[in-house]
Amino acid sequence: MYPFIPPARLLPGSPAPFLPSGPSCPQPSGPYPGPAVRVPGPTRSYVSTNVPFPELPRPNSAPTDPVGPLGTQGSMSSGPWAPGMGGQHPNVPYLFPESSPTPPLPVSGAPPVAWVTVPPGAWEPPAQYPTPEASYPSPGLQPSPNNPYPLPPGPSAASPGPGSLHRMNEIPGGSPSDSSNPESTLESTGQKKHLKLDNKSIKRRRSKKKSKRVTWGDIKTLTHKAESLGKQQGHNTTDPKMMLLCLMTMLHVNSQHESEGSK
């Protein structure tokens, strides 16, 4: 397998070449197998497995050369094969004796136009859509069929402007009441306006008078009056509880006098 190289001739006086006693490479150890022993004999070349297979029978008498024509379905050749090698390509379709049907036309019936073609004539932008005709009526005030409070025609239907005098107690569909009489009622419309509660007239609250500032002199005077009142009734004024009772009585009497004087 490798060419044989003869050893170099030794010159006289030159040292002898170093020759190892054992093999040049150590023997492998482990699970790996040792080197194969070469058997003496003639060496043969390696035979490749890429050889042509024998021709197989094709159905419908189809040609075996993939380079040749395969009918209306085109050629399925995969390379420059020589005739007679056998077209065993897996993608070669089987041929049928009848011809393939014609593909149907589009639904519209017009022939297909390639996308690269341009129709003859100068190109112009598309025309604008026509403006719709004014067939709808103009919006306006339409009377409501289910209006429970129709406005009567005339100047009275207009709403009062700002600053104008108008009656606030008018009710739609009824007669306006007399605003001069506060106790008048709307008998015609079935509605009544009560201005009295529990048959008692409403009174205005009187403004409270500012209370007088209490001084120590007022406290001494009130205490002296309470002590005199307790002595007149025979109570012991030295008792704090009794003195407090007399003082509360004196305050109650003074409040009664003030209320009677204000009336």
Swiss-Prot record:
Q: List the disulfide bonds.
A: none
An example Gene Ontology cellular component term from the record?
Answer: cytoplasm
Main location, first listed in the record: cytoplasm
Q: Where are the transmembrane segments?
A: none
Q: Name one GO molecular function term.
A: identical protein binding
Q: Where in the cell is it found?
A: Cytoplasm; Cytoplasm, Cytoskeleton, Spindle
Q: How is it modified after translation?
A: Phosphorylated in vitro by MAPK1.
In the record, the note on similarity to other proteins reads: Belongs to the MISS family.
Name the chain's protein: MAPK-interacting and spindle-stabilizing protein
